[in-house]
Amino acid sequence: MPSLTTMLGLVSHAAAVERNWLQHYLGGKPREEINGNARGDAPSWDVGTGQTIDGVIAEFDSACAVSRQIAAGFTLDQAVPHDELGQVSLRWVYMHMIREHARHVGHADMLREQIDGTTGD
């Protein structure tokens, strides 16, 4: 079955989601000014042929480092506007990111089982 859901695609998507929630929403940076995909949509899963494992992991690490810098300037209950949700606080964003990453760790677990039969016993 053709799919963009790959181990590396999951990491690439996670980086885009970090950028979207922390840099765009909390940091207030326009998406077009963010270095890398900041939408979390289908293109965020697509790892181009020129990208390497180390490069995609470095992108995720970089996005997380910027996220930590931005979050350091907020209290947990400090809220910012969101175009669909009204207001979101840092606490809400953290909880959303935990859910988002947990869901995709589950996807990675299923992919791993398909690759080599390893299960998370």
Predicted regions and their residues:
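Short, contiguous alpha-helical
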Residues: 1-43, 82-121
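Acidic/histidine-rich alpha-helical segments that form the ligand environment
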Residues: 42-81, 91-97
